[in-house]
């Protein structure tokens, strides 16, 4: 099986995040690099390959995990299902446009640092408009 690329792009930009990393863990450059967050410390664990996991490796993995993407493949290595386990993001959908590309559509949590006394009214209006777009998109996906 050739390495595949997982691309995660945030739906409607509450804060623009898009991530591209190769299966080998190398960040891929993008023309929108100023709006891009690259995945770091990528670990791969494959079902049935317990011999690659020792006690020292598991301690490393468990302390640094932020987001977990579970990709379920069938016997022909076709993607059957994708699941995202994260405190910060919700998976809205996925697509497999090319043989080695997995595109995830994600939605980030709303930031909770709203302090109306210290923010410009125009910025607050823009922020709530973005949040309303997110909520509408979530309701349509249900």
From Swiss-Prot:
Subcellular localization: Cytoplasm, Cytoskeleton; Preautophagosomal structure
Primary localization: cytoplasm
GO cellular component, one term: microtubule
Endoplasmic reticulum is among the record's keywords: no
Top-rank taxon: Eukaryota
Entry keyword set: Autophagy, Chromosome partition, Cytoplasm, Cytoskeleton, Karyogamy, Microtubule, Protein transport, Transport
The keyword Protein transport is annotated on this UniProt entry: yes
GO BP, sorted A to Z: autophagy; chromosome segregation; karyogamy; protein transport
Biological function: Plays a role in starvation-induced autophagy. Involved in mitophagy. Functions with ATG17 and ATG29 at the preautophagosomal structure (PAS) in order to form normal autophagosomes under starvation conditions. May be involved in microtubule function, such as chromosome segregation and karyogamy.
Protein name per the record: Autophagy-related protein 31
Species this chain originates from: Eremothecium gossypii (strain ATCC 10895 / CBS 109.51 / FGSC 9923 / NRRL Y-1056)
